[in-house]
């Protein structure tokens, strides 16, 4: 199981590629990894803020993140999170921008 620090380092290393290929302006981790509750079965929850809109490319982005991290990823855009007030409140409590 990777640590939060390892995940942050991998995302930092790939930040330019994420921006170039997918228009990722900001990327953050939230959920069980940030709270220190992750185990071997946990996925990593990732929030992205994008330069523009994204369609089916979100699937490619998710697959790319899973490939570089070696962990199952739950991915949400900031706009999607903001449109669900209760979800956004949960995310805001433990979000860590990379």
Model-flagged regions — what are they?
Residues 1-26, 35-36, 40, 51-98:
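Catalytic core of pol beta-like nucleotidyltransferases
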Residues 29:
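Conserved histidines in hydrophobic membrane contexts and catalytic metal-binding motifs
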Residues 45-48:
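Short beta-strand->loop micro-motif that forms the acidic, two-metal-ion catalytic signature
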């Amino acid at each position: 199981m990777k640590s939060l620090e390892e995940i942050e380092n991998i995302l930092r290393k790939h930040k330019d590629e994420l921006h170039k290929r997918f228009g990722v302006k900001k990327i953050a981790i939230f959920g069980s990894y940030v709270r220190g509750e992750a185990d071997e079965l946990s996925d990593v929850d990732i929030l992205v803020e994008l330069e523009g809109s994204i369609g089916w490319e979100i699937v490619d982005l998710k697959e790319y993140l899973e490939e570089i991290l070696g962990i199952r990823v739950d991915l949400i855009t900031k706009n999607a999170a903001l449109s669900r007030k209760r979800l956004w409140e949960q995310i805001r409590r433990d979000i860590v921008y990379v």
